[in-house]
């Protein structure tokens, strides 16, 4: 993931400094050449030896340690870096950089680099919400510096609020976006549905399908990577949501229909990756149906709304993408669906094939277009396919 990338991690003297050890370890495991700069206060919380062992490189603290041979050290690291990650970023380092202060190894190196800098603030809630800190963050954002928002929860100061060090996956996602994103969908509003709807029979049982939601989440991540404004309408709560994505949770087809229509007019791209139940029970019991009371059970069903069909009828400027999970005549059924539902693009796959379809991490797909052209792809991970789908959408906008 970070092969051949030179990553400089700045560790400041916040209580979350120990969590940076996990970040450094992950980055190295994923192929990164990781170099650590610690402030003197950070060394009072975690020893430089820890970060040296985890990174496989010398750790810099002192301005004049001459670790990097003949080169002026802060310039050597500044020139080496493909990306800087300041984690945890304290109010002190944010204030220094925002106001041009370079008085230690970390602040001096940040000032000297032309690489992208990603701040990961972590501090007491009152400090984070202090107007001066907020002003400094806004100033840095305006200057092109990037931030990962801290999380809310229980803090080391025994209070609850915003300021917790974020999950490593969120930091790594933002690093990927900065390093590999091409801004293909910058400024575009993309709405993606994911997962399988559930139609209640009673409070315990439901009619559903085998969709895990992984494909929709992979597409959402790929769209966010390309700087889209992503809204993910999700029928599942079991998957982690990538950073920077607005998620709306729904359960059944009617709720999904309401949400998709709510965001439709303001969207540039709609991708219907959710697996929607065609039918729902006419009557839903408000209590668990006991088998002792029913020797047999007949459930009368009625049609759910055809969400994709209705979105196709409403289409104006939107680029509309659908999915077709089939077990035979996949291409023919896909071509028919494009015409019937007024789609611009459709991802078709044979869910009967091993390694394709529901509840697996891979997929085998064909991408069909309204002009009659198509592209077929071999078995790949859903994340890889998600990137391809977003690239193809961007090409045709």
Feature map (PLM): residue ranges:
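A cross-family phosphate/adenosyl-ligand binding-site feature
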Residues: 1-119, 124-213, 217-397
């Amino acid at each position: 993931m970070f092969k051949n990338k030179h990553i400089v991690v700045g560790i400041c003297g916040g209580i979350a400094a120990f969590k940076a050890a996990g970040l450094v370890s992950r980055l190295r495991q994923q192929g990164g050449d990781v170099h650590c700069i610690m402030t003197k206060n950070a060394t009072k919380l975690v020893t430089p030896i820890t970060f040296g062992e985890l990174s496989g490189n010398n750790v810099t603290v002192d301005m004049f340690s001459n670790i990097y041979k003949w080169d002026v050290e802060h310039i050597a690291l500044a020139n080496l870096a493909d990306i800087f990650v300041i984690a945890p970023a304290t109010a002190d380092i944010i204030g220094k950089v925002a106001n041009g202060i370079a008085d230690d190894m970390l602040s001096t190196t940040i000032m000297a680099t032309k690489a992208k800098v990603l701040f990961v603030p972590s501090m007491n809630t009152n400090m984070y919400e202090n107007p001066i800190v907020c002003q400094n963050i806004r100033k840095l954002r305006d200057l092109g510096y990037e931030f990962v928002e801290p999380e809310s929860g229980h803090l080391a100061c025994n209070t609850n609020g915003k300021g917790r060090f974020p999950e490593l996956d969120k930091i790594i996602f933002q690093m990927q976006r900065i390093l590999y994103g091409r801004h293909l969908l910058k400024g575009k509003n993309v709405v993606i549905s994911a997962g399988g709807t559930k139609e209640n029979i009673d409070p315990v049982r439901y009619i559903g399908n085998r969709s895990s939601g992984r494909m929709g989440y992979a597409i959402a991540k790929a769209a966010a990577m390309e700087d889209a404004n992503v809204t993910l309408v999700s029928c599942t709560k079991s998957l982690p949501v990538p950073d920077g994505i607005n998620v709306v949770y729904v359960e059944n087809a009617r709720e999904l229909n309401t949400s998709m229509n709510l965001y439709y007019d303001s969207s540039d791209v709609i991708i219907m990756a959710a697996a929607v139940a065609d039918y729902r029970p006419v009557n839903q019991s408000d209590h668990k149906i006991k088998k002792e009371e029913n020797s047999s059970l007949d459930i009368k069903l009625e049609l759910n709304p055809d969400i994709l069909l209705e979105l196709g009828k409403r289409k104006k400027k939107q680029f509309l993408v659908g999915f077709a999970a089939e077990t035979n005549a996949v291409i023919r059924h896909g071509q028919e669906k494009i015409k019937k539902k007024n789609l611009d693009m459709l991802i078709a796959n044979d869910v009967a094939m091993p390694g394709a379809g529901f509840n697996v991490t891979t997929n085998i797909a064909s991408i069909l277009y309204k002009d009659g052209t198509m592209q077929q792809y071999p078995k790949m991970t859903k994340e890889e396919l998600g990137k391809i789908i977003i690239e193809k959408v961007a090409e045709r906008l």
